[in-house]
């Protein structure tokens, strides 16, 4: 499945919630009719079956993190193999992706922009360039912006936006040096309550 390259707002309208795919700290404005389906008039959303609700939640989370279907399924399989709660393991794996960590640290205004920084070799982990967006960052790893990329206006703009967002407690960031430490894996209480990972587990458990 190819990565979606169309309007970001359309995805948020399809899911009926702000997926935070666009830069900025404000939620998408109500005039954008976030609860209305895509299209000129917004087709009325049919009542979903239990399966439909589970599928919708999976699609929402997959789009938030910008992960393709096969990748997402593999994350679920790995989460199921790990000890502990499968749903929480899944979210921890998604949060541990390098592109997501770069976004959380404020070096990219969106996860898509953070992914681009990684693929363009602008990001280092423990002093070594890593250009794989799905690379799993481990506790105590140091993630930094390469020296030649620190002058990029988009990185500076992203850091300014990040100052207005709530800072993740599992990360420690030095905005001046453009580097941060992944102190620990996030706990479930650290993450959005708007995600219902139990629905995803139910979907894949069938």
Curated annotation (Swiss-Prot):
PROSITE patterns per record: RIBOSOMAL_S4 (PS00632), S4 (PS50889)
PANTHER family, per database record: 30S 40S RIBOSOMAL PROTEIN, SMALL RIBOSOMAL SUBUNIT PROTEIN US4M
Subunit and partners: Part of the 30S ribosomal subunit. Contacts protein S5. The interaction surface between S4 and S5 is involved in control of translational fidelity.
Name of the featured protein: Small ribosomal subunit protein uS4
InterPro entries reported for this sequence: Ribosomal_uS4 (IPR022801), Ribosomal_uS4_bac-type (IPR005709), Ribosomal_uS4_CS (IPR018079), Ribosomal_uS4_N (IPR001912), S4_RNA-bd (IPR002942), S4_RNA-bd_sf (IPR036986)
Cited function: One of the primary rRNA binding proteins, it binds directly to 16S rRNA where it nucleates assembly of the body of the 30S subunit. With S5 and S12 plays an important role in translational accuracy.
Homology family: Belongs to the universal ribosomal protein uS4 family.
Keyword tags: Ribonucleoprotein, Ribosomal protein, RNA-binding, rRNA-binding
UniProt KW Nucleus keyword: no
